[in-house]
Amino acid sequence: MTQDHPPVLFVGAGPGDPELITVKGQKALARADLVIYAGSLVPEAVLQWTPASARILNSAGMTLAEIVTEMENAWLEGQQVVRLHTGDPSLYGAIFEQMAKLSQRQIPYTVIPGVTAAFAAAAALKVEYTLPEVSQTLILTRMAGRTPVPETESLENLAAHRATM
């Protein structure tokens, strides 16, 4: 492993409003040589902080292997790689597979969290998810899609906890 190369950065782009990207995420984009983002999910306006010299790839049509190869090749050249995900990359961000592939190649990486849509929604609606003597627990879940939801995590089972959902 080349120690002087910067780590690959997994950056949360926030919930869609370009002004809700974190300062740390914005700074990461500002020094990026390669940005790989999901064009179907991340608005192009979030890329406004990326230097004109940066290479920008839309991952919508790319396989996991292609994404990892692009990240590896750029990292081996000493470039700053940013993998831009919606919201917070650690929540439904599908970064586990990418991190595992980078670890196999001994490529360091760092995760820069982002604002998740759940909390942006609470702010927009002016609501609080936890209230004294009402609920001190928040459960985040999603509907089944390409990835199924385990039966033990059905809405009925989760609602039995009487927590905020």
Identify what each model region corresponds to.
Residues 2-8, 76, 81, 109, ...:
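Beta-strand/loop-alpha-helix module characteristic of Rossmann-like adenine-cofactor folds
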Residues 1-115, 120:
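Class I S-adenosyl-L-methionine
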